Amino acid sequence: MEKGLALPQDCRDLVHNLKIRGRYVLFLAFVVIVFIFIEKENKIISRVSDKLKQIPQFVADANSTDPALLLSENASLLSLSELDSTFSHLRSRLHNLSLQLGIAPAMEAQGQEAVAEKPSQQAGAGTRRHVLLMATTRTGSSFVGEFFNQQGNIFYLFEPLWHIERTVFFQQGGASAAGSALVYRDVLKQLLLCDLYVLEPFISPPPEDHLTQFLFRRGSSRSLCEDPVCTPFVKKVFEKYHCRNRHCGPLNVTLAAEACRRKDHMALKVVRIRQLEFLQPLAEDPRLDLRVIQLVRDPRAVLASRMVAFAGKYESWKKWLSEGQDQLSENEVQRLRGNCENIRLSAELGLRQPAWLRGRYMLVRYEDVARRPLQKAREMYRSAGIPLTPQVEDWIQKNTQAARDSSDVYSTQKNSSEQFEKWRFSIPFKLAQVVQAVCGPAMHLFGHKLAKDTASLTNRSISLLEERGTFWVT
C-alpha cells in the first residue's frame, strides 16, 4: 500500500484558501467577542448610572458622617467592587478599546464636546497644580477658599459636589459609605481635569444645550463671573445662584470648561470628602499634580457654628440643653464622634507621609489662619507650589480687618483675629463637655486644649490652643 498520495494542485489551493479563511473567521470571532464584552460592560455602567440618577426629593444632611449610597426601594445594592470598577477601571478600558476599534467615545456620541487637556496638564509638564481644599462645614473653608479664588490665574470652584449630594439618595453608615466616596472621587477627578460636563446629570433642573441657571454658588467663583464666561444678561431669566458684582446670563458649561483649561492652575473647595485615603488614585494620576490642604477647626467651635447656621438640624441638641436631660441622643453622639474620627484619621494619614502623598499634603488649623492670615496664605501657596500674587495679599489685608463681622453666616469678611474665639462665649460648658468627651483624640492631635470649667472656657487670658509650628506642613 502506498504511504501517501500527491494531491492535485487544485486541491492544494483549496486547502490553502480554507486555512486563510479560517484565520479570518477566528479574527472576526475575536472582534465579535470584544464587542460583546464592550456591550456587557456598557450595560454595567448604564446600570450604575441609572441607579445614581434617581432623583428623590431629599435634602441630605450637610453634616452627616459617612453618607452611603442608597438605591431604589426594590433595587439590590451594588457591591463596592462593582462601583469602583465601573467608575474607574471599566470606563478607562472601554475608552481605550473604543479608540483602538474606531468607536466614538460615549461623550461625543451623546453630542457633548470632548474635553481637551491643556498641554501643561500632560504628564511631566510639572507646572499646573490641582489644589484641593478639604474641610468640613463651618470650619472657615469659605474664607480660606477665597485665598485661591482671588488669584487671577487659578480657576476656582466652590462646593461642586453639593449637586451630587442633593441628587443621589444618601443614608448614614454601612459598608456602602465607601461607595458614595467613590462617586465623589470620580466626579472630583473629572472636575480637576476641567471636565465640567460631569456635573450636568446632577444639576436640577437639567441644563439645556449646556446652559444652566442652577449651578450652586456660582457667584462664589470669580472665574465663572469673568469674561467670556459671563455672557450677556438675559431679562426675565431667573438665576438662583447669580454672580455678586455683575449681571450675567445663564452659565454656559462649555465656556466655563474652556476658561478652566486656559487658567494656569485649578482649585476646589469641598466639604464632602470624608476620608483622605480615597484621594490616592487622584494623587497617582499622571495628568494631575494634586495638592491637598486639609483645614481643621476646634470641634467645639464647629458645633457652636453649626447650631446657628443649620438650626433646624440641631433641634435635639437644643432640646437637650433647654430641658436639662441627663443624656443626649446616642445617634447625635455617634454622628459627632464619626465626624471627629474621620478628620483625625485623615490627618494622621497625611502626617505619616505615605509615598503617594509625600509633598502633596498640608494640615492647617483655622485658628492659625485667623490669627496670622497672610503668613498662612503664603505657607499654603508655597505648599501648593504656586507663587502668591499681590492681588491676594491685598484682599487678605482688606478682608481680615473688617470693622465688624458680617451678620451673614457665610460671609468671607471677618475681623479674623477676634473671630476665632467668639464661640467660647456662645456655647454652654455642658455642650463643650460632650464635645471634649467624644472628640478628645482629635482635639489632642490638633492642639485644642480641654476646658476644665465654665470659667476657663470663657476666660480669654486662658488659651485653649497649643502653639504649633511647621509640624503642620508635610
Swiss-Prot record:
Residues of the signal sequence?
A: none
Q: Which segments does the entry list as coiled coil?
A: none
A Gene Ontology CC term for this entry? Golgi apparatus
Q: What biological processes does GO assign it?
A: carbohydrate metabolic process; chondroitin sulfate proteoglycan biosynthetic process; N-acetylglucosamine metabolic process; peripheral nervous system axon regeneration; response to axon injury; sulfur compound metabolic process; T cell homeostasis
Q: InterPro entries under this entry?
A: Carbohydrate_sulfotransferase (IPR016469), Gal/GlcNAc/GalNAc_ST (IPR051135), P-loop_NTPase (IPR027417), Sulfotransferase_dom (IPR000863)
Keyword terms, alphabetized = Carbohydrate metabolism, Glycoprotein, Golgi apparatus, Membrane, Signal-anchor, Transferase, Transmembrane, Transmembrane helix
Protein location: Golgi apparatus membrane
PTM section of the record: N-glycosylated.
Question: Pfam families in the record, alphabetically?
Answer: Sulfotransfer_1 (PF00685)
> Which residue ranges traverse the bilayer?
20-38
* Lumenal compartment segments: 39-474
Give a GO molecular function annotation for the protein.
Answer: proteoglycan sulfotransferase activity
In this entry, the parts of the chain located on the Cytoplasmic side of the membrane are 1-19
- EC number(s) on record? 2.8.2.17, 2.8.2.21
Q: Which reaction(s) does the protein catalyse, per the Swiss-Prot or TrEMBL entry?
A: chondroitin beta-D-glucuronate + n 3'-phosphoadenylyl sulfate = chondroitin 6'-sulfate + n adenosine 3',5'-bisphosphate + n H(+); 3'-phosphoadenylyl sulfate + keratan = adenosine 3',5'-bisphosphate + keratan 6'-sulfate
Q: Could you say which protein family the record assigns here?
A: Belongs to the sulfotransferase 1 family. Gal/GlcNAc/GalNAc subfamily.
Function statement = Sulfotransferase that utilizes 3'-phospho-5'-adenylyl sulfate (PAPS) as sulfonate donor to catalyze the transfer of sulfate to position 6 of the N-acetylgalactosamine (GalNAc) residue of chondroitin. Chondroitin sulfate constitutes the predominant proteoglycan present in cartilage and is distributed on the surfaces of many cells and extracellular matrices. Catalyzes with a lower efficiency the sulfation of Gal residues of keratan sulfate, another glycosaminoglycan. Can also catalyze the sulfation of the Gal residues in sialyl N-acetyllactosamine (sialyl LacNAc) oligosaccharides.
Protein name per the record: Carbohydrate sulfotransferase 3
Organism per entry: Rattus norvegicus
